[in-house]
Amino acid sequence: MISSNDFRTGTTIELDGAVWRVIEFLHVKPGKGSAFVRTKLKAVQSGSVVEKTFRAGEMVPQALLEKTTLQHTYMDSGDYVFMDMSSYEETRLTAAQIGESRKYLTEGMEVNVVSWNERPLEVELPNSVVLTVKETDPGVKGDTATGGTKPAILETGAQVMVPLFISVGEKIKVDTRNDSYLGREN
C-alpha cells in the first residue's frame, strides 16, 4: 500500500483490477476543508488517461511491476518472440501488447519487458537505437540556407525527420522516446 501523499510521477498503483501509472499529480490544500491529491493516471495496458482525486493520506494498493531483460529473437505468425538469455525461456507478445514500441524493434535487440502478476504489460525500448535508412529523398546541395529536414523511412518501417545530407543506406541513431534524429553512426 502507498499513501496518496507519496505519489510521484511514474508511481504505479492498482485500481479496479488494472495497473495505472501516475503521470501528473498536485497536492491541494484548500483554505477550508481537507487536503487532497489531484492526479492524472494512465492505464499501462490500454493507454487511456483519467483524472482522479484522492484524499490526502488515502492508502492505495501499489502495483509491483517486474522488469525482465529479454532479447527479441524472431516473429512467428504475428507474435513477437522474446528469449530470456539466462534461462533460454521464450515469451510471446502480440503486436497490441508491444504497442508503438514495435516500430523500432529489430531482431537481436534487448528490451525490458514489464510484467504484473506474471502477465506482460509493456515493452521498454532502449532510449536510442541505431537503424539503417531504407528510403528517403535525395538531398540537393544548396537546397537551403539553413539546416532543413526531410522524412526518412527506416529498416523497421518507422518514419523520422532527418537532415538533408542523410542518404539511403546510412546508419542513424534515433531517440525512441520522441522519434527524433540524434546523429549518424559508423
UniProtKB/Swiss-Prot annotation:
Disulfide cysteine pairs (residue numbers): none
Pathway: Protein biosynthesis; polypeptide chain elongation
One Gene Ontology term of the molecular function aspect: translation elongation factor activity
Keywords: Cytoplasm, Elongation factor, Protein biosynthesis
Family of the protein in this entry: Belongs to the elongation factor P family.
NCBIfam families from the UniProt entry: efp, PRK00529.1
Family annotation (SMART domains): EFP, Elong-fact-P_C
BP GO annotations: peptide biosynthetic process
The name this protein goes by in its record: Elongation factor P
Organism: Prochlorococcus marinus (strain MIT 9211)
A GO cellular component entry from the record: cytoplasm
Role according to the record: Involved in peptide bond synthesis. Stimulates efficient translation and peptide-bond synthesis on native or reconstituted 70S ribosomes in vitro. Probably functions indirectly by altering the affinity of the ribosome for aminoacyl-tRNA, thus increasing their reactivity as acceptors for peptidyl transferase.
